[in-house]
Amino acid sequence: MKMYEILELSNLYNSISNVKLPLKTSYKFARLMKLVEGELTFYQTKFREIIEEYGVKENGEYKLTPDGQSIMIIPGKESECNVKLFELRNLDVPIEGIKFSIEELEGIDISIQELACIMSLIED
């Protein structure tokens, strides 16, 4: 599983965490999130390090892009920063021991994008 899939999995988990599911399915999701907890912490730490290295600061605060959607990157360093972020998001993360059957996921309404992030965990 790639790190970006772990991030999407975390978002899926947050969106369904209050949905009542069969015990076995809930248990598997809880175990899965426990497994990836350390990976999420690792990602957040590395992401902060990259932003610390490449982000533009003004008065001790990160400066936002004109659209206010992201942190401004040091001019001339955008490509280098993007490569590091790409590498971080594409790290391989081994997830073993947890598989879902389609039947176990039947009570969950999810989008195709959300389904894509758990496809590698589904047994046909």
How would you label these PLM feature ranges?
Residues 2-55:
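N-terminal interaction modules that seed assembly of large macromolecular complexes
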Residues 44-124:
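Low-complexity intrinsically disordered segments
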